[in-house]
């Protein structure tokens, strides 16, 4: 299982949140061996450049780490970037059918494909809603 932590390295609490996530991931995926990959980029105002830097729109032949992930922990608010929210909802949530997490999000996170919603705040992590239906 390839897990990508993707976000802004200068955000307060980022390292603490990543550590917290590493502790809870075995509980989210108890039957799988967890292989963690990581990708961190500083903020870019141009979302196209941000996606290119993230390896999503990289030149042919380069590994697209974000698109090969089974789980992505996002450490920024997608609505802050032009087109970023639709990118995650359409390409990651709908097409990839991957678990969908936010870290340090403002507002209510979207549920993942199992209707689970996770919330990571500075110093703590928890499942804020679970709907088994």
State where each predicted segment sits.
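Walker A (P-loop) phosphate-binding motif
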Residues: 1-32
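Short, charged/polar "capping" segments at the starts of alpha-helices
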Residues: 13, 41-44, 81-84, 106-113
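Switch II (G3) loop of P-loop NTPases
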Residues: 37-65
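Short, well-ordered alpha-helix to beta-strand connector turns
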Residues: 46-48, 68-70, 95, 122
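Conserved beta-strand segments of the P-loop GTPase G domain that flank and frequently precede/overlap
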Residues: 50-53, 72-78, 99-104, 128
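Inter-motif core of Ras-like GTPase G domains
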Residues: 59-80
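Conserved C-terminal guanine-recognition region of P-loop GTPase G domains, centered on the G4
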Residues: 83-97, 101-104, 114
């Amino acid at each position: 299982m390839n897990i990508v932590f993707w976000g802004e390295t200068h955000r307060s609490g980022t390292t603490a949140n990543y550590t917290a996530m590493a502790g809870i991931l075995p509980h989210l995926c108890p039957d799988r061996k967890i292989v963690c990959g990581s990708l961190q980029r500083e903020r870019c105002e141009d979302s196209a450049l941000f996606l290119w830097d993230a390896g999503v729109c990289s030149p042919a032949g380069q590994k697209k780490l974000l698109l090969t992930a089974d789980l992505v922990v996002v450490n920024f608010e997608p609505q802050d970037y032009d087109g970023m929210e639709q990118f995650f909802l359409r390409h990651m949530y709908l097409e990839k059918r991957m678990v969908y997490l936010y870290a340090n999000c403002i507002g209510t996170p979207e549920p993942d494909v199992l209707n689970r919603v996770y919330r990571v705040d500075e110093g703590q992590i928890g499942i804020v809603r679970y709907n088994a239906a």
